[in-house]
Amino acid sequence: MEIDRPMSGGRSLVTVVDRIADRLNAQPKCGLMVGIDGVDGVGKTTFADDLGDALRARGREVIRSSADGFHNPRSVRYHLGRLSPEGFYRHSYNYPLLQRVLLQPLTAQGSRRFRFAAFDHATDRPIEAEEQIASDEAILIFDGLFLHRPELRGYWDFTVFLDAPFEVTIPRGASRGPGFGDPDPAATSNRRYIEGNRLYLDECKPRQVASVVIDHSDLTRSNIVTWND
């Protein structure tokens, strides 16, 4: 995918989203798989929703899904302990399930029969979601943690890594309401998430391999840091 280098300087989030949507929409009318990556609280879901809306406004069919629908059961997620950074990084998500019911069906050789989600982490139960059929032109917009892990990296045609320091993302994530954690980055309960994300950043180096890296520290003024694709 040939994409010109971005201009320097911050831009509004709408401008950045539109820039990416224009590049994706300019590709041949075949299915694309797009991953929106970043640490907890950086703003992945909102960015992915906005990108999906921008593509729909350009006449594209969008499949919108998230890693939140593919957690492992609690017994797997916490088997190294509820505060384990290693457990958070290694065991939060069921990658074979994600591959089987969503990613593999949407590849060029896939059946196009997929499910948006397969597990409800709030109830700790599988979701009996109805199978859907994607058109050949549908674009998958998928947000979640750890999307540049080896298990997933080969599926994406284009990725965005939203970057911001933990001093910003931890209180931002906590501001979503009760149940979203302590706003203090130094709180013991946040060590699991911060250190788990650091394991991912060190092992998979998403800043170096993502198609686009965006400084998302200021939600009103996003800056395209690198355009690697």
What are these regions (language model features)?
Residues M1-Q27, G154, F158, E167, ...:
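NTP-dependent small-molecule kinase module
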Residues D40:
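The conserved Walker
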Residues K44:
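Conserved lysine of the Walker
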Residues F47:
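Hydrophobic positions on the alpha1 helix immediately C-terminal to the Walker A/P-loop
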Residues D53-I63:
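Post-Walker A helix-loop "phosphate-sensing" segment adjacent to the P-loop in P-loop NTPases
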Residues I63, N72-T123:
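Conserved nucleotide-sensing/catalytic segment adjacent to the nucleotide-binding pocket
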Residues R125-G179:
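ATP-dependent NMP and nucleoside kinases share a basic, alpha-helical "lid"
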